[in-house]
């Protein structure tokens, strides 16, 4: 029976569908009796499992950079090529990282379900099929329907549990972070290719005080500069680039940025 379940699950995971009742029941039973065997399946077929979502990721990325390219064309009269295989590969690698995460302190069945729903939600948002909130609620409902209400994390070095979040909080962070990081990576590539120096950071109501200090402003990408008599602060310094806790693109950050040209309507 165990061998049959392993064979069945391997096939379903490679096909990218492990959400039906039989799959979840098999995952639960195997995670209780043979968690190492199940983990071995995930690892040995990681490339194939990832490949099942690669096309969806590729299609999503090809549609996600329309605003950046439009701004470049309007501001510089330059029409850049659409997203390349290199950028697509970078984001597919990001999705693979989700599958490979090791700091989720849950039985394998719960971990697999959480990662599956996270990837599904990210794909829905990137393809424009759903808004972030709608995708979030759908993913949360599916997980709660499977009895998963809490997501636990552990320190990968000590093995100790570090924090426990409600599933809606955890999956919201997971979805937003992945989408934002993909978007920022692509934006940086476009700005570099076009030689753009100035960027405008978005703003939104309810921003945390530390983010309100730098949101909605225009910055220079390469140090403090004076352009056409206007002083611009360094973007990465002002917006705390790379600060996971409190910088742009960090945890729970909803800010984005894009090309800016003097005189452009803000």
Report residues per predicted region.
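N-terminal leader/targeting and assembly helices and adjacent pre-domain segments
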Residues: 1-148, 263-266
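Generic ordered-secondary-structure signal
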Residues: 1-6, 23, 30, 160-163, ...
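Arginine residue identity/basic-tract feature
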Residues: 12, 22, 63, 71, ...
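General structural signal for secondary-structure boundaries
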Residues: 34, 49-53, 130-135, 162, ...
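A charged, amphipathic alpha-helical module
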Residues: 124-170, 174, 185-189, 193-194
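Acidic, glycine-rich two-metal-ion catalytic cores of nucleic acid-processing enzymes
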Residues: 150, 165-263
């Amino acid at each position: 029976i165990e061998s049959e379940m392993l064979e069945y699950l391997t096939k379903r995971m490679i096909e990218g569908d492990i959400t039906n009742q039989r799959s979840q029941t098999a995952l639960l039973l195997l995670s209780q009796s043979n968690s190492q065997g199940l983990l071995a399946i995930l690892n040995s077929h990681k490339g194939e499992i990832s490949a099942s979502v690669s096309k969806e990721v590729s299609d999503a990325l090809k549609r996600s950079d329309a605003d950046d390219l439009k701004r470049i064309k309007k501001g510089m009269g330059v029409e850049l090529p659409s997203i390349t295989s290199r950028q697509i590969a970078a984001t597919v690698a990001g999705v693979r990282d989700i599958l490979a995460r090791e700091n989720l302190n849950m039985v394998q069945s719960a971990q697999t379900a959480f990662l599956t729903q996270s990837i599904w939600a990210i794909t829905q948002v990137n393809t424009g099929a759903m808004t972030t909130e709608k995708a979030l609620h759908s993913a949360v409902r599916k997980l709660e329907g499977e009895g998963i209400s809490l997501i636990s994390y552990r320190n990968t070095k000590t093995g100790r549990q570090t924090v426990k979040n409600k599933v809606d909080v955890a999956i919201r962070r997971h979805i937003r972070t992945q989408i934002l990081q993909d978007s920022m990576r692509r934006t940086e590539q476009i700005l570099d290719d076009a030689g753009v120096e100035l960027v405008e950071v978005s703003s939104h109501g309810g921003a945390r005080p530390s983010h309100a200090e730098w949101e909605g402003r225009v910055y220079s990408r390469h140090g403090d500069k004076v352009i056409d008599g206007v002083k611009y602060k360094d973007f990465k310094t002002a917006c705390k680039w790379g600060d996971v806790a409190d910088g742009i693109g960090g945890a729970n950050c909803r800010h984005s940025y894009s090309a800016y040209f003097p005189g452009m309507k803000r």
